[in-house]
Every structure is written in C-alpha cells, then in structure tokens.
Regions:
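Rossmann-fold cofactor-recognition segment
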Residues: 44-57
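Conserved mid-core segment of classical short-chain dehydrogenase/reductases
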Residues: 56-60, 64, 69, 79-101
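Canonical Rossmann dinucleotide-binding motif of NAD(H)/NADP(H)-dependent dehydrogenases/reductases
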Residues: 1-27
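Rossmann-fold scaffold of SDR-type NAD(P)-dependent oxidoreductases
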Residues: 5, 73-83, 104, 128, ...
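Conserved glycine-rich Rossmann-like NAD(P)H-binding loop of the short-chain dehydrogenase/reductase
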Residues: 24-38
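C-terminal helical subdomain
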Residues: 160-163, 167-202
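Catalytic loop of short-chain dehydrogenase/reductase
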Residues: 83, 88-94, 99-100, 107-111, ...
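A glycine-rich helix->loop->beta "capping" turn
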Residues: 47, 65-79, 85, 164, ...
C-alpha cells in the first residue's frame, strides 16, 4: 500500500508506474492536471486524490478519502517534491519565500505528520524524492538542507516504531527516470528496512 504525494508533477508518474509494475496498491495526490491524473489512474489502476498538501484543509479532506481506501494502513509514503528553484537570494522577495520555500516545508511536515498514524504496518517506510536542476539557487539549497536535516531527525524519532526514513535527491536533467523510481521502490521494501537516515544522490 503506497501513497505518492504528487503523482503527476515533479516526475511523479514514474514512481506511480514503477510501484504499479510490482503489484502495489497505489494512491496518489495531485493538485492540477486533472486529465493527466485520470489517464494515469486508468493505466496504473491507482486511486487519484486531488490535494494541495500545503493547505491543511485540503490535506485533511484527502486523508478521509485515503482512510476509506487503505483502511487506515499504509506501507510506504513517497513524498515527491521538485526543489529546482534557481532564484538567487537578491531576487528572493517575501512572496517567493512564502510560496517557494515555506509552503514546501509546511507541506513536508504536515503531510508526514498527518500520515504518521497510517504507517502502522511492519517495516513501514517514508521516502522523500526531490528533483533538482543543474543550477541550484538560494531556495533550492535551503530546501535541500531542510530535507537532509529532516531525514536525520525523523529517522531517529521513528526508529523505535520500525519506520525507515530515507531520501533520494536527483538531477532531473539526467535521463535516469526509471532508475530513480526503482531506487525509491527498493528503499521502501522490507528487505532494506534496516537502511534509514540516508540521503542518496543520483
């Protein structure tokens, strides 16, 4: 049972297809691109749920749908995010800071916190997949550092609950899509549940 937080944007489709090819039961969030979400659902037999994760009301509504689909149990949460913002510090105004950085940080925290009760199966896992470009700016570097700290802290907090927490930060300009998706799937497998607190760069 796998939830992917963005199955349409930020390369999310490759994660949906990779897990589906191995018979996983999948749900994915999307905030736009309705037609793409419907088409992907048909191709992968996955449940699509419209959700803007930085909006707490939208997130709680999505969780009600998810609760009925997965019966309050989840094996893997794949938090898919695009951090390839090349905005420099001198070009970062308050609006860009709130929507480009703070909203992403809020989305990570709120989603993982809200889904924590679902991660109650043996060897559950959280995998953060973050896409970045060749030219990382101030916002990208801030988010990358936040992800590194989050993985380290969260893996310690959830270790006694046998929940592994790892991240993959990858260059989205490289042609390695399915390789990245397969790496995320392998990190979520019970066989590699002893691996936690790692940030892998591809």
């Amino acid at each position: 049972r796998v939830l992917i937080t963005d199955g349409v944007n930020a390369g999310g489709e490759m994660f949906v297809r990779s897990f589906a090819s191995y018979g996983a039961s999948i749900a994915f969030f999307y905030s736009n691109s309705y037609d793409k979400a419907i088409a992907l659902s048909k191709d992968s037999s996955a449940l699509n749920i419209r959700c803007k994760i930085s909006n707490i009301d939208s997130l709680w509504s999505a969780l009600e749908v998810l609760r009925g689909y997965f019966d309050d149990e989840l094996d893997t949460l794949v938090f898919n995010i695009d951090i390839s913002d090349n905005t420099l510090f001198d070009d970062m105004d308050g609006d860009k800071w709130r929507h480009g950085v703070i909203a992403e940080i809020d989305g990570l925290f709120y989603t993982i916190r809200a889904l924590r009760p679902f991660l109650n199966r043996k060897n559950s896992s959280i995998v953060v997949t973050a896409a970045k470009g060749k030219n990382s700016g101030f916002a990208c570097d801030i988010l990358e550092s936040y992800i590194e700290g989050l993985i380290k802290s969260l893996s310690k907090s959830l270790d006694t609950a046998n929940i592994s927490v790892n991240a993959i930060i990858y260059d989205k300009d490289k042609d390695a899509g399915m390789h990245i998706a397969d790496a995320a799937r392998q990190l979520s497998s019970g066989e590699l549940s002893v691996i936690t607190g790692q940030v892998i760069r591809l």
